[in-house]
From Swiss-Prot:
The keyword Ribonucleoprotein applies. Keywords: Nucleus, Ribonucleoprotein, Ribosome biogenesis, rRNA processing. Belongs to the NOP5/NOP56 family. Residues 430-514 are annotated as: Disordered. Disulfide bonds: none annotated. GO terms for cellular component: box C/D methylation guide snoRNP complex; nucleolus; small-subunit processome. This is Nucleolar protein 58. Residues 283-403 form the Nop domain. The gene is NOP58. PROSITE patterns: NOP. InterPro entries: Nop56/Nop58, NOP58/56_N, Nop_C, Nop_dom, Nop_dom_sf, NOSIC.
Amino acid sequence: MAYVLTETSAGYALLKASDKKIYKSSSLIQDLDSSDKVLKEFKIAAFSKFNSAANALEEANSIIEGKVSPQLQKLLEEAKKDKKSTLVVSETKLANAINKLGLNFNVVSDAVTLDIYRAVKEYLPDLLPGLNDTDLSKMSLGLAHSIGRHKLKFSADKVDVMIIQAIALLDDLDKELNTYAMRCKEWYGWHFPELAKIVTDSVAYARIILAMGVRSKCADTDLSEILPEEVEERVKTAAEVSMGTEITETDLDNIKALADQIVDFAAYREQLSNYLSSRMKAIAPNLTQLVGELVGARLIAHSGSLISLAKSPASTIQILGAEKALFRALKTKHDTPKYGLLYHASLVGQATGKNKGKIARVLAAKAAVSLRYDALAEDRDDSGDIGLEARAKVENRLSQLEGRDLRTTPKVVREAKKVEITEARAYNADADTAAVEESASDSDDEEEEEDKKKEKKEKKDKKDKKDKKDKKDKKRKRDEEDEEKKESKKSKKDKKEKKEKKDKKDKKSKKEKK
């Protein structure tokens, strides 16, 4: 006997096929090309109705995930009377799950079964007598909307969008703030150029403009809420002797409007930064503890989502953000970059130049572990303990490389000291002599240390003198050898000249004799 399991928006339908080997038929499409043929081939054997829309959504999600729900299992157990029966299902995952139940079904799910389902879905209202086409389409539409809402609600990727958009907006705000602040200083600098040198903070500069206006009102304006007392005095003194030009009320109104924008942008930037920090602590607490909110958010934004970043190996996380440098190095066969976005992490910043690459590698390895726990842990703890432990290990490694004292891990719990009540001790006069002896012994130790230092210094001085003397002797010997060589060369030259003169003289005398 062959059965076809059909999932509808109203419930599970188990159809009984008249042909036992219908799924093996070579002319299946021609056999099921009309309503009469489909109704002749399939009859309704059992139907399990969904009680509510929530129940329908739950059962549909089970089918999508390839799981057998209790309702479906009960339906199949009631229909397993024939030991040699075959069950045709649409999903391969669902077929594997039904096989694991140990029911007396030969479960089939392949390309041929899709043709059976195509015919069954087309004539489904005719196969199910209690349902008409209009009701079935309405139920299907409602179930489709419910599934869509469920996917949007529980999608982990959608949560990452908040972080990605927030960090992108934060970077844009920083650029805008810098541009506006520079323009404001240049604009107001014509009227009060000395203010930019005294007040370097852009937001404080804008707030001073809003509070003071023209520089002539500076003496009567209270700037204590914006500036410290010393800086306020300097500003007021500079305003009295300023070399700036005068400006009109229209100019001042426009400058104030720009300053107001700067103050508003700065307040919104702080609010956005707090929001990003809270979202990062909620979504990736361990990564946040390890590298910080901004670096962690940039890593997630660069990768696209928390899941895709968690799937990346540590070597990829290490150079994430330095792709151009990496491919340029591979093309020119030079050394590849040691860090990308991780360069801005505080732990990498604490390391010296030669150790930055090593710390970046260790940090990337620990970040990969923290990310996988944040993204994939079923019963995740949001305290960030794993990130804290990983940070402590990276700090210990940094201390080891830099030659500093090793730091203890943050999870070390020290027992509280027990307070014991004892009797008050009487004054012991003998302890005074002991203290004097101890101080004397301490002074002896100090004298011994000083003697040792003096001996070391004397030995070092002797060695330096000996080295200098040896160098002088070597130099003197070299000079003597050079002089001897020069003299030998000179003597050889003189001998040669004498010989040449003698030869010339002999030749001349021979000619005269002839």
